[in-house]
């Protein structure tokens, strides 16, 4: 399978990639499962409240059962009392979902294959900046007619990372930092030839 290498002047040459990695049929259910699992794993789940067992206060009965004229009370930590525990207290929860590595890699292959079919995968020889300037990055992207884009490199340089940090429609990742949500979030995905070859090794 051949992918065109883009330059500011237009397509220039091609690069051979594996059909197994970039020519897969799109599996919507698998991609959906991978996206849901990734987003669930990103949830903090750190909510917490104190129930009647966790709030401070003694276990002593506040007053005797009968003869006072007041309502019966067994503890000052009752949810009915001020400063008592919460009736159905929220507890910390792990929202993560298990997804096999084989399925996860297959989902990434499906997304990359669909991007290639839709001509949203832009292959370049290299993509770097001489200085960490956002203006330079915007100008470089404009040469390729790109604005809403994910840039994938074999190793992300600090200059490129710092320049892209101030653009909310641009993100930079290395091959190991890829996830399904980032791949489907942007209009175009720019990948260097070196990163493409490394991706092929990881996915096949």
Swiss-Prot record:
A GO molecular function held by the record: rRNA binding
Entry-linked InterPro entries: Ribosomal_uL4, Ribosomal_uL4-like, Ribosomal_uL4_dom_sf
One Pfam family matching this protein: Ribosomal_L4
BP GO terms, sorted: translation
Region (Disordered): 49-72
Gene Ontology CC entries for this record: ribonucleoprotein complex; ribosome
Keywords assigned: Ribonucleoprotein, Ribosomal protein, RNA-binding, rRNA-binding
Domain of life: Bacteria
SUBUNIT field: Part of the 50S ribosomal subunit.
NCBIfam families linked: rplD_bact (TIGR03953)
Family, as annotated: Belongs to the universal ribosomal protein uL4 family.
Protein task: One of the primary rRNA binding proteins, this protein initially binds near the 5'-end of the 23S rRNA. It is important during the early stages of 50S assembly. It makes multiple contacts with different domains of the 23S rRNA in the assembled 50S subunit and ribosome. Forms part of the polypeptide exit tunnel.
Protein name: Large ribosomal subunit protein uL4
Species name: Saccharophagus degradans (strain 2-40 / ATCC 43961 / DSM 17024)
Gene: rplD
């Amino acid at each position: 399978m051949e992918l065109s290498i883009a330059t500011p002047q237009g397509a220039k040459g091609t690069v051979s990639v594996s059909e197994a990695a970039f020519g897969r049929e799109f599996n919507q259910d698998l991609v959906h499962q991978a996206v849901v699992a990734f987003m669930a794993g990103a949830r903090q789940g750190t909510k917490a409240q104190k129930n009647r067992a966790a709030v401070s206060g003694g276990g002593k009965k506040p007053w005797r059962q009968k003869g006072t004229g007041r309502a019966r009370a067994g503890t000052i930590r009752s949810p009915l009392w001020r400063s008592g525990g919460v009736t159905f207290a929220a507890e910390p929860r792990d929202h993560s979902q298990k997804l096999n590595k084989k399925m996860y890699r297959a989902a990434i292959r499906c997304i990359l294959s669909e991007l290639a079919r839709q001509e949203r995968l832009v292959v370049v020889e290299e993509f770097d900046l001489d200085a960490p300037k956002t203006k330079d990055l915007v100008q470089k992207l404009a040469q390729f007619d790109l604005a809403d884009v994910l840039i994938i490199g074999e190793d992300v340089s600090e200059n490129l990372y710092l320049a892209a940090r101030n653009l909310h429609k641009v993100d930079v990742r290395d091959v190991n930092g890829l996830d399904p949500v980032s791949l489907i979030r942007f209009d175009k995905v720019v990948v260097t030839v070196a990163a493409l070859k490394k991706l092929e090794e990881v996915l096949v």
